[in-house]
């Protein structure tokens, strides 16, 4: 239970820290951010009392609360209706939270009350990280091996409610899958290989769902290729070897590396690289919250999204170990996050099945 609470709370704490009321999400210079961090007294001194959460946490809560509202053994039609409704409703809470364009525009296009009203058409420009940043809790709700198919379907469909492009919604799959792996204490060095093994299943689901199949398959390879290249670079494509990092991999080098992973020059702003940067930080940080933060929260890329994802996975693995209470005690929406986490724990600890479409 504590790990579930830490997952939801530290995801939001990471988001608030990486966002810094918009100052750090859009400051594309990691060295400047780290200098400002030092001037504020370093990570342990940061009190998030006045640091708002961004769109990432508002939408992650929307996903989580929809999952809780759907209850035990839900019908997928009902779950998708609830997800669409919560995504639409949460748009009223975006003032000062810098929501992504695709998330806002497409959430408002959803018609939750109509049959299939949660579906939007394919769009070749929807590879952003908006689907990935809000999907982690799907892995808290469906963590069991027997629920893998459900995790694939729900993460993809929740993702393509606003990001109907494989680079976008496969990011949601990665976020949810790695959370489930963390719940099951699977060592992080195996996670990447697990994702690669699951991509054919995801593709099969896209074909079976029969919705914009051709367009999705045409744009499929980018996500897969990017991840394969990254796993090869770290030497963990086999899921057995320890990851290798460059000897010199400080703030500046990490900024350059994150930019090199990106689609458009802003590291972590897409569906493939937001979870990738979060994963890179988890691999390097081990049980150190500070090391995780320095790598995933404070950099020149889309820092609140990589932080929200990394904070969730790390929280599942390590709880609140070594985290300064000031980083989360006065966190916005903390009660909601904790309440939702406890409800997800009671649903996720039982191996229920969903009623398919």
UniProtKB/Swiss-Prot annotation:
Per UniProt, where does substrate bind?
A: 85, 101-103, 124, 130, 163-165, 263-265, 269-270
Residues binding Mg(2+) 2: 302, 304-305
The positions annotated for binding Mg(2+) 1 are 54-56, 304
Q: Which Pfam families match?
A: ADP_ribosyl_GH
For this UniProt record, the keywords arranged alphabetically read as follows:
Hydrolase, Magnesium, Metal-binding
Q: Name one GO molecular function term.
A: ADP-ribosylarginine hydrolase activity
> Which catalysed reactions does the entry list for this protein?
N(omega)-(ADP-D-ribosyl)-L-arginyl-[protein] + H2O = ADP-D-ribose + L-arginyl-[protein]; alpha-NAD(+) + H2O = ADP-D-ribose + nicotinamide + H(+)
Free-text remark on how the cofactor is bound: Binds 2 magnesium ions per subunit.
Keyword ATP-binding (UniProt): no
InterPro entries noted in UniProt: ADP-ribosylarg_hydro (IPR012108), ADP-ribosylglycohydrolase (IPR050792), Ribosyl_crysJ1 (IPR005502), Ribosyl_crysJ1_sf (IPR036705)
Give its E.C. classification number. 3.2.2.19
Q: Which GO terms describe its biological process?
A: protein de-ADP-ribosylation; protein modification process
| Primary enzyme class | hydrolase
Source species, domain of life: Eukaryota
- GO CC term (a single one): extracellular space
Cofactors per UniProt? Mg(2+)
What binding partners and quaternary form does the record give? Monomer.
- Tell me, in a sentence or two, what this protein's role is: Specifically acts as an arginine mono-ADP-ribosylhydrolase by mediating the removal of mono-ADP-ribose attached to arginine residues on proteins.
According to its UniProt record, which protein family does this protein belong to?
Answer: Belongs to the ADP-ribosylglycohydrolase family.
Q: What is this protein called?
A: ADP-ribosylhydrolase ARH1
Organism per entry: Homo sapiens
Organismal lineage: Eukaryota, Metazoa, Chordata, Craniata, Vertebrata
């Amino acid at each position: 239970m504590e790990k579930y609470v830490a997952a939801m709370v530290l995801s939001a704490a990471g988001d608030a820290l990486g966002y810094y009321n918009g100052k750090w999400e859009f400051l594309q210079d990691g060295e400047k951010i780290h200098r400002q961090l030092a001037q504020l007294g370093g990570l342990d001194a940061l009190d998030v009392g006045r640091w708002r959460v961004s769109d990432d946490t508002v939408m992650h809560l929307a996903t989580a609360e929809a999952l809780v509202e759907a209850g035990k053994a839900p019908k997928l039609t009902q779950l998708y209706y609830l997800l669409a409704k919560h995504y639409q409703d949460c748009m009223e809470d975006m003032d000062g939270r810098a929501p992504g364009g695709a998330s806002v525009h497409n959430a408002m296009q959803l018609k939750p009350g109509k049959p299939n009203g949660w579906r939007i058409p394919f769009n070749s420009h929807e590879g952003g990280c908006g689907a990935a940043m809000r999907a982690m809790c799907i892995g808290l709700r469906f963590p069991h091996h027997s629920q893998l198919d459900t995790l694939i379907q729900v993460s993809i469909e929740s993702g393509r409610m606003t990001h109907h492009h494989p680079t976008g919604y496969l990011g949601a799959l990665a976020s949810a899958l790695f959370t489930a792996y963390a719940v099951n204490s699977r060592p992080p060095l195996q996670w990447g290989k697990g994702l690669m093994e699951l991509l054919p299943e995801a593709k099969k689901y896209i074909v079976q769902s029969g919705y914009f199949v051709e367009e999705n398959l045409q744009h499929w390879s980018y996500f897969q290729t990017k991840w394969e290249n990254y796993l090869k670079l770290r030497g963990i494509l086999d899921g057995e070897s320890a990851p290798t990092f460059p000897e010199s991999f400080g703030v500046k080098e990490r900024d350059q590396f994150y930019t090199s992973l990106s689609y458009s020059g802003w590291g972590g702003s897409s569906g493939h690289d937001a979870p990738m940067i979060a994963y890179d930080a988890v691999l390097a940080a081990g049980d150190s919250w500070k090391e995780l933060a320095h790598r995933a929260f404070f950099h020149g890329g889309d820092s609140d999204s990589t932080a929200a994802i990394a904070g969730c996975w790390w929280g599942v693995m390590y709880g609140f170990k070594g985290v300064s209470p000031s980083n989360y005690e006065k966190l916005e929406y903390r009660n909601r996050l904790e309440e939702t986490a406890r409800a997800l724990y009671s649903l996720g600890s039982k191996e229920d099945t969903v009623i398919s479409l």
